[in-house]
Amino acid sequence: MSLQIPHREKSNGSGGATKAVILVGGASRGTRFRPLSLDVPKPLFDVAGHPIIWHCLTAISKVPSISEVYLIGYYEESVFRDFIKDSAVEFPNVSIKYLREYQALGTAGGLYHFRDAILKGRPEHIFVLNSDVCCSFPLNEMLQLAQEKDAEAVILGTRVSEEAATNFGCIVSDSHTRRVLHYVEKPESHISNLINCGVYLFSADVLFPSIRSAIKRRTDRPRLASYRSSENLASSFMIDDDEESQKNEVIRLEQDILGDMADNKQFFVYETNDFWRQIKTAGSAIPANALYLQKAKQSGSKDLAPPSANIIPPVYIHPTAQVHPTAKLGPNVSIGPRATVDAGARVKESIVLEDAEIKHDSCVLYSIIGWSSRVGAWARVEGTPTPVTSHNTSIVKNGVKVQAITILGKECKVGDEIRVQNCVCLPFKELKRDVANEVIM
């Protein structure tokens, strides 16, 4: 007996209003992004000269039918105030608002909590983007696929290695129709190397009923607790109502919604062959920086520094930064506001943040130099390259520091002629001796 899929009436193809939601998380999330997230929320960390969330917003602004964007998370409202004010000037055709959750509600729970605001004006489609994703965001192509297939949901997918696939949500799809047949979040065994990229397009009249159904399933589930003896049998079934209701409110798209959509909805996947990676750990900002800079170079962005004998493109230099003409930069380097790079310095595959100093004849490779940090003369700060295709986020493996990007937190000082290799250095540390493969507390 074949499964009968209910079909909605075909839309007229013109495409109605669309809204976008960017999920930004909160202070208790993104802890793997430390020490950088100790001073700046991860969504506002600069990658390729702009906050991570700016890249999402730029892609959204290129979808003509989107005029409203919501940032949903549980940071303090003041955190995004300046960003929203600046973005209103840069993206005048898009209204941007921050909606603060009273607690962490999950990727679907936050959407459902603010459903009235999102559904105001009766949008036809809703984009949902995770802010910690680095990709080209083919939103117009996803919208076109949704209209062609009369889809109720479209997920962005990409291919990764078989070994890496089980770290993500895995998609089984029909290669001809692109229909999603099965979805499993982080399966224990290999199912597919087509994975969830964390970018979704939902029909507005399907998304919230699907979340409501997931909440109902969670609420109706028998509330049983383990017990140690017959003496506490009666009390073992008594679960604190506040604790239980709090758990019921945490609803996640990946674990609670997408699997059911694959079973009974018109659910399709748009597979991208362009770049994609997550920005989970602090070190993952370096390959993301390279990918965004390469994209800017391909699009002929005027933000990039013009190539020269000492500028190997792509390189971003903030207008307020000071770079000596004899310093050599690139490829894939971002220099932040008021940073200084002195004579004879070499910077490659790195991010130099606001007010940092790179003194003369020093060398910075595969590293992030934190805000107001200083790299002394003739010093060498070096990390290990992370392949763009690698999705490993481990910092320590078997008790040993994994060789990876070197990160200096805020206001760190590396002395003259000091070598720092494969280290993570927490803020306000002064390094007076050579160090390698350490987390410096």
Q: In which residue ranges do the predicted regions lie?
A:
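C-terminal accessory/binding modules appended to enzymatic or scaffolding proteins
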Residues: 316-317, 322-346
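Catalytic-core segments of class I nucleotidyltransferases/pyrophosphorylases
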Residues: 123-127, 134, 140-148, 160-165, ...
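Eukaryotic N-terminal low-complexity, Ser/Thr- and Lys/Arg-rich leader segments
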Residues: 1-18, 90, 120, 127, ...
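Glycine-rich hexapeptide-repeat left-handed beta-helix
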Residues: 25, 344-441
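Long, charged amphipathic helices and adjacent flexible linkers at domain junctions
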Residues: 293-321
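Conserved N-terminal catalytic core of the sugar/cofactor nucleotidyltransferase
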Residues: 1-41, 45-141, 402, 419, ...
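Short, hinge-like loop/turn segments at secondary-structure boundaries
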Residues: 86-89, 117, 145, 170-176
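Short loop/edge segments at beta-strand edges and connector loops
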Residues: 73, 100, 130, 155-157, ...
